[in-house]
Amino acid sequence: MHSCGQILEILPHLIEAGVNVVNLMQPNVFPIPRLAQFKGKVCFEVCADAQSSLPKGDEAVIAKEIQGLLDACCSPSGGLIEVQLDRMYFEGDNVPRPIGAFCHAEYRRRDPFLQQT
C-alpha cells in the first residue's frame, strides 16, 4: 500500500485487514521514531523523505534519517525495504542524482542485518 500522508491512526486497522507492506514517501510526517510501534508487524518500503530531505541533498541529514528508519523499523521478522531512487525522484522531486547512490550505500553500510553476515 502506498501513502504520502500521515496514516498513523489507521495503520493498526490496515495491518489487521492484511496490509503487510506500506510504501512511505514522507516518513517524517509520523515522526519516524513512532514507526517503531509497528516493528515486526508490517514492512515499510522507504528511502528517505521525498519532500523534506531528499531534494535538499544534505547527506548528513539523509544519513541520520536512514539510521532513524533502520532503528525504528528493522527486526528479525522484517520491517524495512529500501526504495532505490529512480527517474521519478530525480526528475519529479528534483532529488540530486548522486543522492541515489549515497542512499543505497548508507543503507548497505548501516543495515544491522547485513552487518551480521
Describe the residue ranges of each PLM region.
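Active-site loop segments of alpha/beta catalytic cores
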Residues: 1-117
